[in-house]
Amino acid sequence: MQGSMTASEIAKIVREEGLYAYASCSLLEDHLYSSVYSNWNAGYRVEKNGVLTGDQWYDYFPDQGGQPWLDPNSDLTVAYLQNIIKELSSSGFSAVLCSDIKYPNFVQADEKYLNPDIYAKNPDALIKLANALNAAASDATDIVLDLSAYNAMNGGELVYDPSKLDVSYALLETSSGDASSVSSWASSNSGDMSVSLSYTDGSGNGHCVINY
C-alpha cells in the first residue's frame, strides 16, 4: 500500500502530538533501486578474472526469487542513500534508525563472481557508508545504527566499530532473556558512542530501552 502523505507532513503530525519523529530505513537490503537498469551500478556486479561482465549479482537464481542488493562500495549507492537521509532530515525527523548496513550472506560459489574484497566482506566500506550518512544529516537529526545485539557481540555487525565511526548513536535489538548479557557487553564496547538497548518486556508486547 502506498500513502500520499509526504515525509514532511508525517513528521509535522508527530511533532504536533508532542512526540519525536523517528524514521526507520532498511538500507543495503534494498531490492528495488538497483533492479532498474540505469541504476545497476548501485548493485553488486559480476566479475570474472578481474573484469566486470555487465551482469548483476543476485542473492539466488533470479527466476526463483533471487534479488539484487545495494553495494556499499558503489558511489551511486552512497549518493542514493545520502539523498534519502537528506530528505528525511530536511523533513523534520529527529532521528533516522538505519538498519541492514550489511553484506548479503554470500555462498562459496559467489567467490567466482565477485570482487575478492567484496566477497571477503570488507567492513571499511560499511563504516565509510555509515559515516557518509551521518555527514548528510543536519545537526537536528541523529543517525542511529539499528543493529542486532547478538550479531554485534559475535562480530556479525561489521559496521559496528566505535573507534572508526563518526556516528554517535547505536540501538542494539535483543530479547529480554539476553538483556543482562548484552547490557554487560554494551557497557564496555561502546567507545564514545551512546548505545541504547531495546528489548521486549517478556510478553512480546512492550518495548523497553536502556541507554548507556
Residues of each region from the PLM?
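Substrate-binding cleft of secreted/luminal carbohydrate-active enzymes
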Residues: 167-212
